[in-house]
């Protein structure tokens, strides 16, 4: 949790609740071309075996040792400035690259680093404004560019890095929007589906019947399906039209017990990851409602800040960081047991 970015990320709520923000931009066709990533080169990956950033190396031992499973992680929206005219991020810009490493890699992707060899591709993600209906037409084109990069990255990952290992797909926010499309095209009902340990599709609505063959998982050691959730402060809702479109009816997994429990006491909470990289266990109670995980205000030094807001989208993963880490390791272990490895 990185305090300087709390309000930047929280701006997503403004879009989906209809608040007006004035953005400077230009027609998509007039956007300057951004150099495409080349996933055969390590410079196009934020994280790849042999290129583990020091800022996450403390999360596990033997960082140079190859694991028996892989993790493909897609990070959330990071470019959101109202004065930024670009439709897609320039992944060659050092500030953007540093943001990827110091925000989602450090506080989100790190939850899966003990589960498998971590792969995080840089991609020309779409600017936050694409989720505003005012920019819908050009926004779709920007999202298509982002997906094209991730599609190329996943193909290269499977054909050149994976070597037939089982894998996890994990994502957040815009990353989940793309992950759903990626799974539909390459995994669901395809030959490699049997290699999917689990998909953690966080921070974006995922319908129960999103895929033809992959189904929501409802036990902590289940494999071959997906989990999903969106987090809000307890007893709080977004605006009605927002709730109906972005939340209601979406799969809502329990990110503490990973079963069908509707309410979970803080005594079972394994721990959240705070901005100083300290773990705070037994910090929150949760309750599942239609399309959302309701969380109590976390018991930590930033409690006052959390009490002032209702949308916990920006900490969908951080709040359950240890719970995710331990569950992912369990599912990896279970995959190998069930497949007689």
Set out the residue ranges of the language-model regions.
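Bacterial Sec-dependent N-terminal signal peptides
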Residues: 1-23
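A general structural signal for short secondary-structure junctions and capping/turn motifs
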Residues: 3-4, 61-64, 109-112, 189-191, ...
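Flexible, membrane-associating and regulatory peripheral segments of lipid-active enzymes
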Residues: 19-105
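Active-site catalytic motif of lipid deacylating hydrolases and related acyltransferases
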Residues: 24-30, 76-165, 301-318, 322, ...
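Gly/Ala-rich beta-loop-alpha elbow adjacent to hydrolase catalytic centers
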Residues: 171, 175
